[in-house]
């Protein structure tokens, strides 16, 4: 459970107990709403996850917000990039975002290729000389699998070929 103190600090229950004790406050057995109210603190409820965005984004916590008198974890779409200076070298938010997207694209491409390779492996048997199948149909399917990486939208939007029957 997260707790918001009078100062606006947000911490977990164990931290709050230590914080209260370190500041001369009382100790208690079970943390209840009544105990927190007496100590001038509030429970922080889990807020709604952020939705929407792009394939590069995810919901991430960004502080707390008060809604109808209760405190909730606030979520935003991330990641959030900011200009940074490390050892005198500036890396802009745009540069970080470009690098992040390239990494995500590479990860997704690797995953799609692994799926494609698995589909190819699963139908290798169709290319054996004595396989009782229409080799031309299967060869066309297998080539379509190999061509998945050339599709517009790769690696995020894939139209998989239909496996022959």
Residue ranges and their predicted role:
Residues 1-165:
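A preference for well-ordered globular domain cores
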């Amino acid at each position: 459970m997260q707790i918001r103190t009078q100062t606006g600090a947000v911490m977990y229950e164990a931290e709050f107990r230590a914080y209260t004790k370190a500041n001369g406050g009382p100790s208690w057995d079970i943390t209840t709403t009544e105990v927190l109210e007496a100590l001038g603190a509030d429970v922080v409820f889990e807020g709604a996850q952020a939705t929407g965005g792009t394939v590069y984004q995810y919901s991430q916590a960004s502080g707390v917000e008060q809604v109808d008198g209760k405190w909730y974890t606030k979520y935003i779409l991330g990641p959030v990039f900011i200009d940074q200076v490390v050892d005198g070298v500036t890396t802009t938010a745009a540069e970080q975002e470009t690098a992040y997207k390239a990494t995500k694209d590479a990860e997704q491409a690797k995953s799609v290729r692994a799926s494609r390779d698995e589909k190819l492996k699963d139908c290798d048997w169709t290319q054996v000389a004595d396989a009782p199948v229409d080799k031309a149909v299967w060869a066309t399917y297998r080539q379509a699998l190999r061509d998945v990486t050339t599709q517009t939208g790769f690696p995020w939007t894939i139209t998989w070929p239909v496996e022959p029957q």
